[in-house]
Regions:
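Conserved acid/base catalytic micro-environments in cytosolic active-site loops
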Residues: 1, 6-21, 27, 32-33, ...
């Protein structure tokens, strides 16, 4: 537990210690202290503030991931600057984040505490070796990424024999894809970055993306992705016309719906103050609307994330004849959402995150 506020350290410690399966073994008051204790104590999970004296949270994450890879949850303010800093921390190797003000996590303190404990338990299941592999990805200079040759014949990443077999079966269907739809949650920012930065400028489909993320974060995240990727990426707005080579990120705190026809599809952003739907944005809602407009001409992908959001929406797509893929357990930060569609028999293919770009390009070329 890393924070320079003694009040916040006590509060988080009390919340975590309510679960008999969790124990706060020590606290750190700054980034330097955090790095030293991470190396010495080898905790399963670290909670980390961003703004601290001597060494800030972002630099502390970088050093910890280099010297003693550990699952790290960042606490962040829900501001534009807080969002940018949190995204930098995730890029440095942190796996998850939560608002520092508990009333911004949930409407009552007990629910907020329960969610924090759940997140810690989920991330504690990560092994340090897997964390080291996940943390090796770092964003490259945006100019380098933008200057890479745009081509649909990008070098193929190897896939297993069963994966190649399933892909060849789909090719004979002659499916004409009209949309790529992606849903994700915990671990999604880095996973999306790994996938989208490898897509060429002339990518032939529009892309919709649903990432569980607070309202204050999605605009900063979309802007960050846009600087790193060759395709155009923006936070979705009502009235946006879906265009090839453009990716639309659902805004936090709202729902993203597709209207119109597959050749004239537009986005509609809905305010959602109800308690009926837990996730805002919801993968199920966006995927369900994609099924109505695009039918089976969708390639749907469920990436790393906690829970089962996306399972019902993927089933609706699948029933229309769409193709559904999921991220494999090994490369997931949390194997929840991908597991849900896999166990339900909805997903046709499980891939490591690094394998998605080439597999997507092959699939949409051949149908």
């Amino acid at each position: 537990m890393v924070d320079d506020s003694s009040f916040f350290r006590r509060r988080v410690t009390d919340i975590l210690n309510k679960d008999p399966n969790l124990e706060v073994i020590d606290v750190a008051i700054n980034g330097i202290d955090a790095v030293e204790k991470a190396i010495a104590l080898k905790p399963d999970v670290i909670t980390m503030d961003i703004e601290m004296p001597l060494l800030n949270g972002i630099e502390a994450v970088k050093q910890i991931m280099a010297k003693a890879p550990t699952a790290i949850i960042m606490f962040s303010s829900l501001t534009h600057d807080g969002a940018k800093a949190t995204l930098e921390a995730l890029d440095a190797g942190a796996l998850d984040f939560l608002p520092k003000k508990f009333n911004e996590i949930a409407k009552n303190t007990e629910d907020a505490g329960s969610l924090l404990r759940q997140r810690v338990i989920q991330l504690a299941r990560k092994k340090s070796g897997r964390l080291a592999r996940i943390s090796t990805f770092r964003s490259r200079d945006s100019r380098e990424l933008k200057s890479q040759t745009s081509t649909l014949t990008s070098k193929a990443t190897s896939v297993t024999r069963s994966e190649r077999s399933q892909t060849s079966i789909r090719k004979s269907s002659g499916k004409q894809y009209k949309l790529l739809a992606i849903g994700t949650s915990t671990g999604g920012p880095v996973a999306l970055q790994k996938l989208l930065t490898q897509l060429p400028e002339d990518f032939p489909l529009p892309i919709i993306m649903v990432q569980h993320m607070p309202a204050a974060f999605t605009l900063a995240f979309a802007k960050r992705l846009n600087t790193l990727c060759k395709i155009n990426i923006k936070q979705a707005e009502s009235g946006d016309v879906l265009k090839p080579g453009c990716a639309y990120l659902a805004p936090g705190g709202k729902q993203m719906i597709i209207d119109g026809t597959e050749n004239a599809a537009k986005l509609r952003i809905l305010e959602d103050d109800s308690e009926r739907i837990a996730f805002k944005p919801s993968v199920d809602i966006s995927f369900g609307s994609a099924a109505k407009v695009f039918g089976g001409n969708v390639l749907g992908i469920i990436l790393t994330g906690m829970g089962a959001d996306g399972r019902d929406g993927s089933r609706l797509l699948k029933n229309k004849g769409a193709t559904i893929w999921a991220q494999d357990e090994e490369s997931c930060v949390v194997y929840g959402m991908p597991q849900a569609v896999t166990v339900a028999g909805i997903s046709e293919l499980s891939l490591a995150i690094e394998s998605f770009p080439s597999a997507i390009l092959k699939e949409i070329q051949h149908g």
